[in-house]
């Protein structure tokens, strides 16, 4: 019996069984450790697992790799319309549910945005300006200047100023035409937006072409640096080109603002020229704002329209070119309401088809389709507990394709044939941190469409359309400008023929 126990075959069998049971025990122990490790991070909100900190790294990397907008759509599709990830190690909710979005937008404790502090410092937005100013007190101090400039007399003046600008630029269309006669619509729109903004808010002669290029460089830097981890800023050569782009625009704007300061100091009468920049400069003189904050506010006011609205109108023109029945409806209303005369402020409320077209374009092909916020106090949203300091991304573009609209995945004016409750359609947001320029933006888009479409019919190259266009959905959704076929054909209209509609 002793010999049998010492038999090599029996010893091997015992060793194999011991290894098997030992392996199972180790796996169970690892599983227990993982469960204990993740226990504190377990959330009732759907989302990827923590996995010893690997989950947060993967989710942050996905935002850097795919872009903010694309990553939000990916995660909402994967985990539902109210889900949780991590950005920079911080818990971040991605929400595309209308009731939750409505709750967040209307409450004051969600007025703060989030982003990399070092990234925002690099582009000059950390605790300055209005767009990504994360200091609620400083944000509240500058917002009234924007609200005043973008409403009241400024809103009334926008019609004439914008109409004059687009007429001027259409008269020299050869500047943005290539050798084949195709029009670079993006450059055209950016110049019109910049010129209009300058005439309304700054009033200093500038080099449109050079400044438009600098604005694009600044936006690229803003988009690239907004969510970068702190380690990125430890390696100077990684962000040097972005730093230069930011400096180029800041330096150019500082020269213009200094010229404005000089004109103010030597002017005998200012009553007729108390524009946005002048108001800020006087606030600086009273000690209410720093010089750096004034410069950043002016910079942001000047880049807002060339940055996003130019792309919005670009997409609209492509949609018009691809939907002739929509173009016919637009032209019928334009010639009924405006006719051959100059567009006026009292036309704005009468252009209902144009307005519905703008809304449907912004719903179907948004440029800014999400909003970033931070919870400033504990809350409960649709039954989910939300802790103070939680980052939140409101995926508005996805919401616009999930709820209410009869044909959410089609471009059709039928989607706005009836009044849409504002909780289901929020292209500009609402509540205390809604877009300050939402009313003036609507006026500007109406004026541009009416003025341009009365003079030209637009066509795309080789059947190009927004659905097939190569796009990047990061801080905003925009076309890949090197992909080709983005220029359009502008055909002069026969006014008499148009009036027959």
From Swiss-Prot:
Subcellular location, record wording: Membrane
Q: Does the keyword Heme apply?
A: yes
What InterPro entries does the entry give?
Cyt_P450, Cyt_P450_CS, Cyt_P450_E_grp-I, Cyt_P450_sf, Cytochrome_P450_Monoox
Cofactor(s) recorded in Swiss-Prot or TrEMBL: heme
Binding sites annotated in the UniProt record for heme: 435
Q: In which tissues is it expressed?
A: Ovary.
Q: Single Gene Ontology BP term?
A: response to estradiol
Extract one GO cellular component term from the record: endoplasmic reticulum
Matching entries from Gene3D superfamilies are given as: Cytochrome P450
**Its membrane topology:** Peripheral membrane protein
Q: What S-S linkages are listed for this chain?
A: none
Reactions mediated catalytically: testosterone + 3 reduced [NADPH--hemoprotein reductase] + 3 O2 = 17beta-estradiol + formate + 3 oxidized [NADPH--hemoprotein reductase] + 4 H2O + 4 H(+); androst-4-ene-3,17-dione + 3 reduced [NADPH--hemoprotein reductase] + 3 O2 = estrone + formate + 3 oxidized [NADPH--hemoprotein reductase] + 4 H2O + 4 H(+)
For this protein, the Enzyme Commission number is: 1.14.14.14
Query: Does the UniProt entry include the keyword Repeat?
Result: no
The Swiss-Prot or TrEMBL record describes its family as follows: Belongs to the cytochrome P450 family.
What is the official name of this protein in its record? Answer: Aromatase 3
Tell me the organism. Sus scrofa (Pig)
């Amino acid at each position: 019996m002793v010999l049998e126990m010492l038999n090599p075959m029996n010893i091997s069998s015992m060793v194999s069984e011991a290894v098997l049971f030992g392996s199972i025990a180790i796996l169970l122990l690892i599983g227990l450790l993982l469960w204990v490790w993740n226990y504190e991070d377990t959330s009732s909100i759907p989302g990827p697992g923590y996995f010893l900190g690997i989950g947060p790294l993967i989710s942050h990397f996905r935002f850097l790799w795919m872009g903010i907008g694309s990553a939000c759509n990916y995660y909402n599709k994967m985990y539902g319309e109210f889900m949780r990830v991590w950005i920079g190690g911080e818990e971040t909710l991605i929400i595309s549910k209308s009731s939750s979005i409505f709750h967040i937008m209307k409450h004051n404790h969600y007025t703060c945005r989030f982003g990399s502090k070092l990234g925002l410092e690099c582009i000059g937005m950390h605790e300055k300006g209005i767009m990504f100013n994360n200091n609620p007190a400083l944000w509240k101090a500058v917002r009234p200047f924007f609200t005043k400039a973008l409403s009241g007399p400024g809103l009334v003046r926008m019609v004439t100023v914008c109409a004059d600008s687009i007429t001027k630029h259409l008269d020299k269309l050869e500047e943005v035409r290539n050798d084949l006669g195709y029009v670079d619509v993006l450059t055209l729109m950016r110049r019109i937006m910049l010129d209009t903004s300058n005439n309304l808010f700054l009033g200093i002669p500038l080099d449109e072409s050079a400044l438009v290029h600098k604005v694009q460089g600044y936006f690229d830097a803003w988009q690239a640096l907004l969510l970068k981890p702190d380690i990125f800023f430890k390696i100077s050569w990684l962000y040097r080109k972005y730093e230069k782009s930011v400096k180029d625009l800041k330096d150019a704007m500082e020269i213009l603002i200094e010229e404005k300061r000089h004109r103010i100091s030597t002017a005998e009468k200012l009553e007729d020229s108390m524009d946005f920049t002048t108001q800020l400069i006087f606030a600086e003189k009273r000690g209410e704002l720093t010089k750096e904050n004034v410069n950043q506010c002016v910079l942001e006011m000047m880049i807002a329209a060339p940055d996003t609205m130019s792309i919005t109108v670009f997409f609209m023109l492509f949609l018009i070119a691809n939907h002739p029945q929509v173009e016919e409806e637009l032209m019928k209303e334009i010639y009924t309401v405006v006719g051959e005369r100059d567009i006026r402020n009292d036309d704005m409320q009468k252009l209902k088809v144009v307005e519905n077209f703008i809304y449907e374009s912004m719903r179907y092909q948004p440029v800014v389709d999400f909003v970033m916020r931070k919870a400033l106090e504990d809350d409960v949203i649709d039954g989910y507990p939300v802790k103070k300091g939680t980052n939140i991304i409101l995926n508005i573009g996805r919401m616009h394709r999930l709820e209410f609209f009869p044909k959410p995945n089609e471009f059709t004016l039928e989607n706005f044939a009836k009044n849409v409750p504002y909780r289901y359609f929020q292209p500009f947001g609402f509540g205390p941190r809604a877009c300050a320029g939402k009313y003036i933006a609507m006026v500007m888009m109406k004026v541009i469409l009416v003025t341009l479409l009365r003079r030209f019919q637009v066509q795309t190259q080789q059947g190009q359309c927004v659905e097939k266009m190569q796009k990047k959905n990061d801080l905003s959704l925009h076309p890949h400008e090197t992909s080709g076929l983005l220029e359009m054909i502008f055909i002069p209209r026969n006014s008499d023929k148009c009036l027959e509609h």
